UniProtKB/Swiss-Prot annotation:
CDD domains found in the cross-reference section: Chitin_synth_C
Phenotype for residue 562 to E: Loss of activity
Activity regulation comment: Requires proteolytic activation.
Outcome of swapping residue 607 to A: 95% decrease of activity
Source taxonomy: Eukaryota, Fungi, Dikarya, Ascomycota, Saccharomycotina
Keywords: Cell wall biogenesis/degradation, Glycoprotein, Glycosyltransferase, Membrane, Phosphoprotein, Transferase, Transmembrane, Transmembrane helix
Regions of compositional bias (Polar residues) in chain numbering: 11-41, 133-143
Function: Polymerizes chitin, a structural polymer of the cell wall and septum, by transferring the sugar moiety of UDP-GlcNAc to the non-reducing end of the growing chitin polymer. Required for septum formation.
SUPFAM superfamilies with a match to the protein in the record: Nucleotide-diphospho-sugar transferases (SSF53448)
MF annotations from Gene Ontology: chitin synthase activity
Biological source species: Saccharomyces cerevisiae (strain ATCC 204508 / S288c)
Effect noted on mutating residue 393 to A: 5% decrease of activity
Protein name per UniProt: Chitin synthase 2
Documented EC number(s): 2.4.1.16
Length: 963
């Protein structure tokens, strides 16, 4: 067992000097019925004759004894009160050796050195989360609760190498503990000078016992029996430091170190070796069941976005604790949820976000170390169970907030979001073993029941491997952001996707992408096969895509690695996993309000989606190796066919747009005066604009050519609006004239109106039609511009496989180092800087938290010069551009602008209407199945209660807007 140099050794625990002859004659709580004599009896009076003679002041207490004493007495006061014949002298024999109130017998249990750092936590006990558990209440003894928050410049700690106990050993210790109250034989009751005082001290003083255990866990080497041993042993540095006193005074619960002390772990290994090297998390050491692990990935988002997300998650955890009738949740539900925040790079993280975390108590900057024994730290892990929250207005909130187990992993290097997920799935999840893993992006605000709704899908259907939440756009106060056409068009796009696309794919069982802003996975489904293949292996292949070792196709495909993960789950060998859409779980996210950021974001989305769709189409045969039913496999093939058609339309989207403009605008040549002149002007204008877009996209970044992109998009919108007006004017004149030659254009207008009508009908059926009134006009006017601009820029930048679209912050602060050296007594000593003035820094952070942030303009990032990627990019653009150009020239040669019998245009427009109708059918099927489940659930509740008056249904309220 690792020893704390500040702790009094068992041989020094007695008030007598070391080496006293009567050391082994102290007995605990002896009574007249015990076979062990009481020291106060006359038969032993001679043995304690030394107590009648003054032999000097008692042994000096350790720093830990002073720190954990109930009244925190000074050393001189301790001497005075402990002197012989002092009127306030405590009975030190009884105080040091008194028995724990939770043990009824007088047996002594020898605690093994491999005991857990914390007592086992029984999450199933119906204990009020706002009150203390009887087992957690500190006993009123000499070393009671309370801690003196003093700091020192150096922290020295003794360590030894220990081996983690196996599960069998842990069960043996538990059995000994449970049977000790009735067993009094000599084998289970050990009385010796070497073990008696130590055993009784650790057992009978819970507060000091916890301190010893925490000290033992601070730096040790541990082997995991079921994993292969590491090639090189490394010292594991774990430091527990009190949270600031200003925060501690506001906490309703202070009965456990998880509330009062922040733990820091300096991880010097890669995430794949986290468990094998002996690293763990404090919540796992407490033996708690983990139902949900919520992962928040962060790059350089500001404190307002972080506060919005974390506060909404805390309200979700509080909702879980309110579900008292649930078979899983209830008052202690917070113990089954772990919130893991992973920041991608210490140099990239926003300082305001760090201040926010420090205000919660989970982050202390001075605790982080640069290296341990010369090994560079890969990740800084901070752990705390926080009981307060800070909302988006940066105000403290404690009402209706339950404790939340929070882990903050600050990666030393910036290795992209996929590496953050590697830390989650390969490092933390094997330790916590969660049932469901929920992924949330910083900036997403969840409704109060989102986490529960996502978890409930997995609980009700054992075949569900993943679930997608409903993503909404933040429209600002009173919806003022909708005046920005960019925000309004994205709002309409998100709504149509939530009403048509996601429900359709959910009915088939395969959702092409689970949004990273709000999605959930079953951890068991993510695990690889025994041969190493599986979803996670395919998912993390994208982290090492560099240079000629991997082709551009693979590199771009892994820009949408979440799409690959969705496919691998559904097509997992010898399984029958499906993906579902959860309409009730909503998350509001901020969308790009600037054109440059919007183009950069969609470039990654479009390239990743196209190459991932090609990957799924080429590997559709993997479905045959699954255990899906024949009916499921048939409908999955129907979905593959639908996606293939959608992919073809996407590939030829530029050509279809140009041809639609060409014939709609050309229809006015013979209708109005100077119609042909207008047609020629707009025709050459759109051709020149498209050619300019290719040049701009090939040689400029959106941040550097923002105005050029905006100008091109405005021109495309004007041309599209002109062609649409021409089509409607020509259709109305055709209706007025009643000529047979113009019926074909009437069909064109009807096909267009039917497409928009289907959108409106579906929105009404989902009781969410407001976007049709507030955002549809902006969407339809900007759709051609977005289609052309985004497609051209995406294809012209297939060589760019980078992720980041945001600037970085300033240089990171230099960290101190931790050195483990060999002491003269054979023990290992860890020397490192200890944080100074924790309380003062906390006050500074609180005052700085409310200050507004001013973002500094970041310089242009260094662009990749990989000739191989650029060569492949050129070939892809040439093939795509020439294929669209050949289609345009072929159709133009067949049909003239004045030709009313244009079969190709009719085919395109009715195809769009047919695809929209197919999506509507799938959406209505999803809605029908949803209401059918509600009816069946209601019927089951009625049959269970025997009455039609069911007081409270655990059903989603579909007629009210979710919060």
């Amino acid at each position: 067992m690792t020893r704390n140099p500040f702790m009094v050794e068992p041989s020094n625990g007695s008030p007598n000097r070391r080496g006293a002859s009567n050391l082994s004659k102290f007995y605990a709580n002896a009574n007249s019925n015990s076979r062990w004599a009481n020291p106060s009896e006359e038969s032993l009076e001679d043995s304690y004759d030394q107590s009648n003679v003054f032999q000097g002041l008692p042994a000096s207490p350790s720093r830990a004894a002073l720190r954990y004493s109930p009244d925190r007495r000074h050393r001189t006061q301790f001497y005075r009160d402990s002197a012989h014949n002092s009127p306030v002298a405590p009975n030190r024999y009884a105080a040091n050796l008194q028995e724990s109130p939770k043990r009824a017998g007088e047996a002594v249990i020898h605690l093994s050195e491999g005991s857990n750092l914390y007592p086992r936590d029984n999450a199933d006990l119906p204990v009020d989360p706002y009150h203390l558990s009887p087992q957690q209440q500190p006993s009123n003894n000499l070393f009671g609760s309370g801690r003196l928050y003093s700091q020192s410049s150096k922290y020295t700690m003794s360590t030894t190498s220990t081996t983690a106990p196996s599960l069998a050993e842990a069960d043996d210790e538990k059995e000994k503990y449970l049977t000790s109250t009735t067993s009094y034989d000599d084998q289970s009751t050990i009385f010796s000078a070497d073990t008696f005082n130590e055993t009784k001290f650790e057992l009978n003083h819970p507060t000091r016992q916890q301190y010893v255990r925490r000290a033992n866990s601070e730096s040790k080497r541990r082997m995991v029996s079921d994993l292969p041993p590491p090639s090189k042993k490394k010292a594991l540095l774990k430091l527990d430091n009190p949270i600031p006193k200003g925060l501690l005074d506001t906490l309703p619960r202070r009965n456990s170190p998880e509330f009062t002390e922040m733990r820091y772990t300096a991880c010097t290994v890669e995430p794949d070796d986290f468990l094998r090297e002996g690293y763990t998390l404090r919540f796992a050491e407490m033996n708690r069941e983990c139902q949900i692990a919520i992962c928040i990935t962060m790059y350089n988002e500001d404190k307002y976005s972080l506060a919005r997300t974390i506060h909404s998650i805390m309200k979700n955890v509080a909702h879980l604790c309110k579900r008292e009738k649930s078979h899983v949740w209830g008052p202690n539900g917070w113990k089954k949820v772990s919130v893991i925040l992973i920041s991608d790079g210490r140099a990239k993280v926003n300082q305001g976000s760090l201040d926010y975390l420090a205000a919660l108590g989970v982050y202390q900057e001075d605790m982080a170390k640069a290296s341990v024994n010369g090994d560079p730290v890969k990740a800084h892990i901070f752990e705390l169970t926080t009981q307060v929250s800070i909302n988006a207005d940066l105000d403290y909130v404690s009402k209706d907030i339950v404790p939340v187990q929070l882990v903050f992993c600050l990666k030393e290097e910036n290795k992209k979001k996929i590496n953050s997920h590697r830390w989650l799935f390969n490092a933390f999840c094997p330790v916590l073993q969660p049932t469901v893993v929920t992924l949330v992006d910083v900036g997403t605000r969840l409704n109060n029941t989102a986490i529960y709704r996502l978890w409930k899908v997995f609980d009700m259907d054992s075949n569900v491997a993943g679930a997608a939440g409903q993503i909404k756009t933040m429209k600002g106060k009173w919806g003022l952001k909708l005046f920005n056409p960019l925000v309004a068009s994205q709002n309409f796009e998100y709504k149509i996707s939530n009403i048509l696309d996601k429900p359709l794919e959910s009915v088939f069982g395969y959702i092409s992408v689970l949004p990273g802003a709000l999605s959930a996975y079953r951890y068991r489904a993510l695990k690889n096969h025994e041969d190493g293949t599986g979803p996670l292996r395919s998912y993390f292949l994208g982290e090492t895509q560099e240079g000629r070792d991997h082709d551009v196709f693979t590199a771009n495909m892994y820009l949408a690695e979440d799409r690959i993960l969705c496919w691998e789950l559904v097509a997992k060998r010898d399984a029958k996993w499906v993906l579902k859409y959860v309409k009730e779980a909503t998350g509001e996210t901020d969308v790009p309000e600037d054109v440059s950021e919007f183009i950069s974001q969609r470039r990654r989305w479009l390239n990743g989606a196209m190459f991932a769709a090609i990957y799924a189409q080429l590997h559709f045969y993997q479905i045959w190796k699954t255990k899906h039913s024949v009916v499921r496999k048939f409908f999955l093939h129907v979905e593959f066919l639908y996606q293939f058609i959608q992919m073809l339309f996407s590939w030829f989207s530029i050509a279809n747009f140009v041809l639609t403009f060409y014939y709609l605008a050309g229809s006015m040549n013979l209708v109005i005066k100077h119609g042909e002149a207008l047609f020629i002007f707009f025709k050459y204008l759109i051709f020149c604009d498209l050619a300019s877009l290719f040049i701009i996209s090939m040689g400029n970044r959106p941040q550097g050519a923002k105005h050029l992109f905006i100008t091109s998009m405005v021109i495309l919108s004007i041309c599209a609006t002109y062609s649409l007006i021409c089509g409607f004017v020509f259709a109305f004149k055709s209706l007025a004239s009643g000529t047979e030659s113009h019926k074909i254009f009437v069909d064109i207008v009807i096909s267009l109106l039917s497409t928009y009508g289907l959108y409106f009908f579906s929105s009404l059926m989902y009781l969410d039609p407001w976007h049709m009134f507030t955002s549809s006009i902006q969407y339809f006017l900007t759709l051609p511009a977005f289609t052309c601009t985004l497609q051209i820029f995406a294809f012209c930048n297939t060589h760019d496989v980078s992720w980041g679209t945001k600037g970085s912050t300033q240089e990171s602060k230099q960290l101190s180092k931790a050195i483990v050296v060999q002491g003269p007594d054979g023990k290992q000593i860890v020397e490192t800087d200890w944080p100074q003035e924790v309380d003062k820094k906390f006050l500074e952070i609180k005052s700085r938290l409310k200050e507004p942030e001013f973002e500094e303009s970041s310089g242009n990032e260094k662009q990749s010069k990989n000739d191989y990627y650029r060569d492949i990019r050129t070939r892809i653009v040439m093939i795509w551009m020439l294929s669209n150009l050949i289609l345009i020239m072929s159709i133009i040669q067949v049909f003239t602008p004045q030709d009313t019998d244009n079969g190709y245009l009719i085919f395109i427009l009715w195809s769009v209407a047919a695809l929209a109708a197919f999506r509507v059918v799938g959406s209505m099927a999803f809605l029908f199945m949803k209401y059918l489940r509600i009816i069946v659930s209601y019927r089951n509740k009625v049959e269970g209660s025997g009455s039609w008056e069911v007081s409270k249904l655990d059903l989603p309220n579909v007629f009210h807007k979710k919060g």
